[in-house]
Amino acid sequence: RQLYLDWIPQIMYNHHQSGPAGSVVAGPPYRDPFNHVYDPLVITTLDAVGAAMSSRLNLEGKPGYTQRNGSVFSTWFNGGLRTTTYFHNMVGILSEIIGSPTPSEVPLVPARLLPNGATPFPVTPRPWRYADSIAYSLSLNYAVLDFAARNRDALLFGIWRMGRNSIERGGRDHWTHYPRRIAAIQEAHARDNPPAKSGATEDDDSGASAAGRRRIPTRYFDDVLRKPELRDARGYILP
């Protein structure tokens, strides 16, 4: 009630612990694939807030932020404080940070030492104190608040636009694309166009390899993905 009826925030941030070994903190953007039932603006705004968080740490010389495939966190668990917000067109943030009142060390994890898209600024093995975790958490708070202050109009318009999108979707036929339905397009095309039995190899452009690379006619989109029985429900009537 407090979150969804009284406050109705545009961003909700949940601090949690602990982060993956060899990193300091895991946060957004989260790993692919994201839950494809969400409005795409939820995901892109989530990415933007995540970029502000990691950039703030980098600016302050605080390494160890990991994202996407650098952690196990996704947008698929529907029972958490952070993930339920997505169904209300809010940007739910979860960060998982290392540290506790007991001093510890950042362990050596060789696979995390090379900078990449998941961990642009790797942390090296070092002693870790609870004060370090608090300093990182404060920086992340300021990053989110600064982003919200600088993008106030965009966030307010965005949550309105997402709500409007939901209303419009409820007034017309709509289909959600699921992996199994995407695979059904390829299966239907393969059934209708079996590869030639000419002894062709994968490197032979005249045989099965070339058939697999041929463009699939757009009629398969309507035939498979736009079946009336696969339409999203416009509402549910409970007795």
Predicted regions and their residues:
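Loop/turn elements at helix/coil->beta-strand transitions in domains of secreted/extracellular proteins
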Residues: 7-11, 54, 63, 88-91
